[in-house]
Regions:
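Small/aliphatic-rich secondary-structure junction motif
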Residues: 2-55
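General small-molecule cofactor/ligand-binding pocket signal
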Residues: 40-42, 89-93, 142
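Short secondary-structure boundary segments
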Residues: 43, 115-116, 145-146
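Short, hinge-like loop/turn segments at secondary-structure boundaries
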Residues: 56-60, 108-109
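Glycine-rich, Arg-bearing micro-motifs that act as flexible, cationic patches
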Residues: 110-135, 150-154
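Structural beta-alpha unit
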Residues: 1-7, 20, 78-111, 148-154
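Short glycine/serine/threonine/alanine-rich loop segments
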Residues: 35-38, 86, 139
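A short acidic, glycine-rich active-site loop
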Residues: 58-69
């Protein structure tokens, strides 16, 4: 069995503009630096159920708004990529976040998600998207939590 050493791995990371997803993106980029993998930052959007089928106003560009969010998150972590040497590709898709991430993770080495996104209850240890991905992903999943803040020793 021959092995092609030129094939780079791919790390998929969910990005939604939350602090947890920023931590996940930082972790994915750091891991890619160590392994030589590429990073695919995936963001998605949905029309809110409360919209009732009506658009907020004509030419409302949810995809464009989401693209700006993911691009800003990537820029804050890797800038233009020169300082890290990691190629980060961004993907924006309409759909349910867990399904979008699972589809993107096909063929990936790793799926990285934050422990909670924008819509999770603050008391939960793991959001519904992270839980769904952890139990259904076609590859290993890493769920990134924010660092624990310990009280100073007395």
């Amino acid at each position: 069995m021959s092995e092609n050493k030129d094939v780079r791995g791919r790390i998929v990371v969910g990005v939604d503009g939350s602090d947890h997803s920023a931590l996940a993106l930082r972790w994915a980029v750091h891991q890619a630096e160590r392994t030589g993998a590429d990073v695919e930052a995936v963001a998605c959007w949905q029309w809110p159920a409360s919209a009732g089928g009506f658009l907020p106003y004509e030419n409302f560009d949810m995809s464009g708004i989401t693209r700006k969010t993911v691009d800003a998150a990537v820029a804050s972590v890797v800038g233009d990529g020169e300082q890290t040497g990691v190629a980060v590709r961004t993907t924006v898709v309409e759909g349910y976040p867990a399904k979008v991430l699972l589809d993107a993770a096909q063929g990936a080495e790793l799926l990285v998600v934050g422990s909670r996104g924008h819509h999770a209850l603050s008391g939960l240890l793991l959001g519904s998207v992270g839980l769904h991905c952890a139990t259904h992903a076609p590859c290993p999943v890493l769920i990134v939590r924010e660092p624990v803040q310990h009280a100073p020793a007395r």
